[in-house]
Amino acid sequence: MWRWVRQQLGFDPPHQSDTRTIYIANRFPQNGLYTPQKFIDNRIISSKYTIWNFVPKNLFEQFRRVANFYFLIIFLVQLMIDTPTSPITSGLPLFFVITVTAIKQGYEDWLRHNSDNEVNGAPVYVVRSGGLVKTRSKNIRVGDIVRIAKDEIFPADLVLLSSDRLDGSCHVTTASLDGETNLKTHVSVPETAVLQTVANLDSLIAVIECQQPEADLYRFMGRMIITQQMEEIVRPLGPESLLLRGARLKNTKEIFGVAVYTGMETKMALNYKSKSQKRSAVEKSMNTFLIIYLIILISEAIISTILKYTWQAEEKWDEPWYNQKTEHQRNSSKILRFISDFLAFLVLYNFIIPISLYVTVEMQKFLGSFFIGWDLDLYHEESDQKAQVNTSDLNEELGQVEYVFTDKTGTLTENEMQFRECSINGLKYQEINGKLVPEGPSPDSTEGEVPFLGSLSHLSNSAHLTATSLRTSPESETELIKEHDLFFKAVSLCHTVQISNVQTDGIGDGPWQPNLAPAQLEYYASSPDEKALVEAAARAGIIFVGISEETMEVKVLGRLERYKLLHILEFDSDRRRMSVIVQAPSGEKLLFAKGAESSILPKCIGGEIAKTRIHVDEFALKGLRTLCIAYRQFTAKEYEDVDRRLFEARTALQHREEKLADAFQYIEKDLILLGATAVEDRLQDKVRETIEALRMAGIKVWVLTGDKHETAVSVSLSCGHFHRTMNILELINQKSDSGCAEQLRQLARRITEDHVIQHGLVVDGTSLSLALREHEKLFMEVCRNCSAVLCCRMAPLQKAKVIRLIKISPEKPITLAVGDGANDVSMIQEAHVGIGIMGKEGRQAARNSDYAIARFKFLSKLLFVHGHFYYIRIATLVQYFFYKNVCFITPQFLYQFYCLFSQQTLYDSVYLTLYNICFTSLPVLIYSLVEQHIDPHVLQSKPTLYRDISKNGLLSIKAFLYWTVLGFSHAFIFFFGSYFLVGKDTSLLGNGQMFGNWTFGTLVFTVMVITVTVKMALETHFWTWINHLVTWGSIIFYFIFSLFYGGILWPFLGSQNMYFVFIQLLSSGSAWFAILLMVVTCLFIDVVKKVFDRQLHPTSTEKAQLAEAHSSVKCLDSVCCFPGETPCASVGRMLERVIGRCSPNHISRLWNASDPFYTNDRSILTLSPMDSSTC
């Protein structure tokens, strides 16, 4: 029993095997010794709550937040002891915040419940008792055989058993899982591929042993043990056999598969897990400010308590006769009384901590994140992709970036490969005018044309491809033809490219038809490099036709050749190569390999290695992507050994990856080099301009790529990452720690000696590993003094290590990583902000990123406009919230000096409750959503303005102290201005009476509401109709509410303290004079400071505002005038000169496609930038 309890609490989890055993069709052994493993059902549960646990679970989650818990404690203190304010003052705002959050989360969870019910209730067909049974998806059990028809979604993770194809293969699309739109081929084992009917499957006796569930979509290890005629046949299972839940069946009429993972154990469900939480610099500053204000709160409570007891200790200040202490008070413990009074003062001043700050910030981030997706400037028309926001918690972090780390291929480049050149057996060729010719002839010359290769007209444009007629040639030319033949055969066979049969109705069904003309073939591949190379081979006359029953078919000069595909040695980032083993028509066993020259050339023992290496370097200097091609021929005995090793590695359930790596290492050796290929990956549009803009903004750009040194440097120069005038330093080919350290010291000396010029650093993966191992500080010193850094030959984890090294450096800079492929996920998740490019290498980077965009050039708009605006908005929001709460509570503290620390409240309880909820909340919320202190086009055209907000400047201690001191000074003016103007002089009132406590407090509260609201108006640079509505509407609402609240006797209120108070206040001319005088006095200080700052020490942003205001139409007229009216033109000119701001002119309701930035109907909610013709 105790162990069960510990297991339920998670302290003693039950032992779980590393593998699971699945009996197909749930045919368990009948010997009675087998205990079936327990598996979960196939229900998907994405919801968090049930109808029974919603209230307690949601409350628990909300009160884990420090601010909510703090106000809960204050509320409980008010209930337990005699406090000066009603528990409603803390309880109602807390109830409002908790209720709004609970409703939002409850509604979202209700939507998740509906979605779950729809998915779990979907109809499926399962093979049971020799027939097909219709059931619901949630009823599928592990071991069930499921039938899926064309275009249906797989309801669980299935191991493919058979399909309507003879070879048992099928095509699926995983676009909903990883975003990859290309079709993927999945295969079944030969023994089950022939079982294409329900009756045949009912006779299958087989067991699957596989790993326990894991989230990696591309990793699966298992084996199938089939019993046939009392013999057991073992077949390996890999990712190519697993059909993932959420994927869709394509190009296949139907398949049968056995469920191996169900419900929340499917890979799709395991990927629901959220990424590690990232916290922005603004959030960290906000938490710091909360701690400071908590210290201020406790200090005020302690000071008030001490002063109270100090006063009571003096005999002359004893309690008056009408307020004598009770017997209980005189006999109670002084310590308990001190604690009680301290808690009472704590309750009295607790509103200095803004309860609504968290809710307002959440709403601002949530609503503000939509603007990125609505921005047409971030929409890519060709791919029909708009910007995506995967997390709204980091919007303001986009305005604080100091380092950008970017991948190259697919991020800076288009990832659209075009075959350009190749090297075959030491001879270099290039494509000129559709012909592959040796290097040297002019474009119009045909002399020297390769006799075997012929026309290079594009595959998609030719109805039929024929090679040029072979010329009569001597033996040397015949040998040359054979070498070229073998080279392009290797290119046509060593790949994972697939073919769809182009028909009038789209993708055809059925097996491949090798007699199709090339124009009827369409290649598609997950790697653009492979597609480009296979198409180039086809243009050269060696056409890959397709795969039929594990046979690769190639047309050579119109003659069909069949190669039996024996093994595929898949590509991985560690080996940086892939290989295939095929059996040629002649019966020879051949291995064809292709990969990076650093992984292929060391494995070669023959061929023109030296010449090819030179050609590869020449290709790289042109910025071309290179691959080397090699082959190996096996004897019968060698192949038996290779086949045995691969079988043992692939059927292993433990350490399969390590065993496969060892097997690949053993097999891929003693290669004969055939040549190398060079494909061009052109730069994306406006990459150079974007990188230059980032540099002007003070952001350092690092390029992290897996390409070789020469290719990476060439691309860095072409994209403007490196300048021609820049001094390029290199840390490459380091073999030892000592050599690496010495090279780093030399680089540091060179930078010190040539400190005037800019430096760029190139470092390769091997040298980087040595530098990070023992010489981090020295390496960082060199990097910090370089304007641009290029890291080549990088492994995915090395990219993440580099970013982490920068993150933990003493300066703690904000980092941003941008990439497009699965190998970029680690660095995207490591950086403070991760940007995924929705490119051609799937959607893994976009799915794991914080933001996703279609092109690198959109990064400038994302940072310089959205990031700038978001940071300005939320930084002002945070500072303003603390400012207005200091204004709110400080008069309460000052009032205690005049009421002898009796804990008498200055404000009415209703005003205490509604101050942050109703009277002052909307103006700052709208400001934080639509404020544009400068035109977006100016921000993009002047990247240097980005420097003004760097280093979290608006939330620095200096800025925090300014807002805090401003709040205290305004509070002193509120209190003492009211006290000296109307609080002491009875002649100011017509009836000869002094203001009472509630009238005095209401006067202070009225001045405060008006002042903090107009203060928000002074901070606003971009006025829309909704700004006017909430700003002036908040003040009007306060007056209407106060008249309504104080003008009626409310029967349900315990006291009528405010009855007729506000009406009496407004009836006094001296009160109106005091309100106007105090508001002007408070804001005059702020206006004077702004004027002097702009005249004496203007920032770059303020200079741009002034320049923009002078060059624009006087747009302040729109605040108070209709078009054509000019009563306020002179006021507008004066204010524009002083503070350099404007508001949009009268705007038509007609939307224009040329309108910049957002596409909203601007007459409803103007979220667009200030029109350049107006401001």
Swiss-Prot record:
PROSITE patterns registered for this protein in UniProt: ATPASE_E1_E2 (PS00154)
Family annotation (Gene3D superfamilies): Calcium-transporting ATPase, cytoplasmic domain N, Calcium-transporting ATPase, cytoplasmic transduction domain A, HAD superfamily/HAD-like
Annotated binding of Mg(2+), by residue: D407, T409, D820, D824
Pfam families: Cation_ATPase, E1-E2_ATPase, Hydrolase, PhoLip_ATPase_C, PhoLip_ATPase_N
Reaction equations catalysed: ATP + H2O + phospholipidSide 1 = ADP + phosphate + phospholipidSide 2; a 1,2-diacyl-sn-glycero-3-phospho-L-serine(out) + ATP + H2O = a 1,2-diacyl-sn-glycero-3-phospho-L-serine(in) + ADP + phosphate + H(+); a 1,2-diacyl-sn-glycero-3-phosphoethanolamine(out) + ATP + H2O = a 1,2-diacyl-sn-glycero-3-phosphoethanolamine(in) + ADP + phosphate + H(+)
Cofactor or coenzyme needed: Mg(2+)
Sorted UniProt keywords: ATP-binding, Endoplasmic reticulum, Endosome, Golgi apparatus, Lipid transport, Magnesium, Membrane, Metal-binding, Nucleotide-binding, Translocase, Transmembrane, Transmembrane helix, Transport
GO annotations of cellular component type: early endosome membrane; endoplasmic reticulum; Golgi apparatus; phospholipid-translocating ATPase complex; recycling endosome membrane
Transmembrane segments annotated in the record for this chain: 69-89, 91-111, 287-307, 338-358, 862-882, 910-930, 963-983, 994-1014, 1033-1053, 1060-1080
Subcellular location: Recycling endosome membrane; Early endosome; Endoplasmic reticulum; Golgi apparatus, trans-Golgi network
GO BP: any one term: phospholipid transport
Membrane topology, from the record: Multi-pass membrane protein
GO molecular function, one term: magnesium ion binding
Keyword Translocase: yes
Active-site residues, Swiss-Prot/TrEMBL: D407 (4-aspartylphosphate intermediate)
NCBIfam families: ATPase-Plipid, ATPase_P-type
Subunit structure as annotated in this protein's UniProt entry: Component of a P4-ATPase flippase complex which consists of a catalytic alpha subunit ATP11B and an accessory beta subunit TMEM30A.
Its job: Catalytic component of a P4-ATPase flippase complex which catalyzes the hydrolysis of ATP coupled to the transport of aminophospholipids, phosphatidylserines (PS) and phosphatidylethanolamines (PE), from the outer to the inner leaflet of intracellular membranes. May contribute to the maintenance of membrane lipid asymmetry in endosome compartment.
Protein name, as recorded: Phospholipid-transporting ATPase IF
Biological source species: Mus musculus
Gene assigned in the entry: Atp11b
